[in-house]
Swiss-Prot record:
Protein role: Specifically methylates the guanosine in position 1516 of 16S rRNA.
Transmembrane stretches, start-end: none
Descriptive protein name: Ribosomal RNA small subunit methyltransferase J
UniProt similarity note: Belongs to the methyltransferase superfamily. RsmJ family.
Originating species: Shewanella sp. (strain MR-4)
Annotated Gene Ontology cellular component terms: cytoplasm
Cross-referenced Gene3D superfamilies: Vaccinia Virus protein VP39, YhiQ-like domain
Coiled-coil stretches noted in the UniProt entry, renumbered to this chain: none
Top EC group: transferase
Length: 261
């Protein structure tokens, strides 16, 4: 049995999922990402309306999770989200004449990576969980085909077919910024976690080894590392950042190595 790892946590491969074995597209996707059919698996992958979706089988009323860079909330933010004035843009050092090359080391569903790409950054996404990586790949496929955003998406946004920053460091050209948004356990007192996040956390779990991400991120980035954290979370790995950019519910801890030029 193969395994993929980032820091200490190891995800054993292949990953069990439920899917229609008579659907060639699904069979191909699952084979590519080492996902194997299991009649008792808690999650199902479906391919409907040219879109790969993930479903939690014991909560059939929940909508499927998919990656969509073309419509919905991400499209609205791209058009009306504040451009380079956004906190995330300031955190990665976007400014006039400076458009950094970014590695998103915890890509998830790709939303922050998409924001940065839409603002001009070249973004390489790293996602260690194969199911999430499959969703990302499908979202990119549809975005690349879109008449409005396809051209610049193909130029600026890609998925690294590997599971760790260490693996990426062996292949990647110079990286200006590494961006990290580790999954953080929600407070029991917090408002109901969004349905999507609940499904996502059940699949992936909290990044209990997140502290181990900082060192390889610092080794890979030439300019800075940016860590997105809930406002109540401690510093990653207990290391004090060079500066902090605060938002309503989160903050961006910035670890500066050299000036952005």
């Amino acid at each position: 049995m193969a395994a993929i790892s980032t820091c200490q946590t190891v995800i054993p491969l292949p990953i069990p999922v439920f899917f229609n074995q008579q659907f060639p597209t699904l069979v191909d996707i699952c084979a590519r990402w080492q996902l194997v059919f299991d009649a008792d698996a808690p999650f199902e992958l479906r391919f409907e309306s040219d879109t790969l979706t993930l479903h939690k089988r014991d909560e059939p009323k929940l909508d499927g999770i998919m990656v969509d860079f073309v419509t919905g909330a991400v499209a609205h933010r791209r058009k009306f989200g504040g451009g380079r004035g956004q906190s995330i843009a300031k955190a990665v050092g976007l400014k006039q004449g400076v458009t950094p090359k970014v590695v998103d080391g915890t890509a998830g569903l790709g939303r922050d990576a998409f924001v940065l790409a839409s603002l001009g950054c070249t973004v390489t996404m790293v996602e260690r969980h194969p199911v999430v990586a499959a969703l990302l790949e499908d979202g990119l496929r549809r975005a690349y085909q879109d008449a409005e955003i396809g051209d610049w998406m193909r130029e600026r946004m890609q998925l690294f077919h590997g599971s760790s920053l260490e693996a990426l460091a062996k292949l990647e050209q110079e990286v200006d910024v590494v961006y990290l948004d580790p999954m953080y356990p929600h407070r029991d007192k917090s408002a109901l976690v969004k349905k999507e996040m609940r499904v996502f956390q059940t699949l992936v779990g909290a990044d209990l080894d997140a502290d181990g991400l900082l060192a390889p991120a610092m080794a890979l980035a030439s300019k800075r590392v940016v860590v997105k954290r809930p406002d109540y979370a401690e510093d990653l790995a207990g290391v004090k950042p060079s500066m902090v950019i605060e938002t309503k519910k989160n903050r961006f801890d910035v670890y500066v190595k050299s000036a952005m030029k």
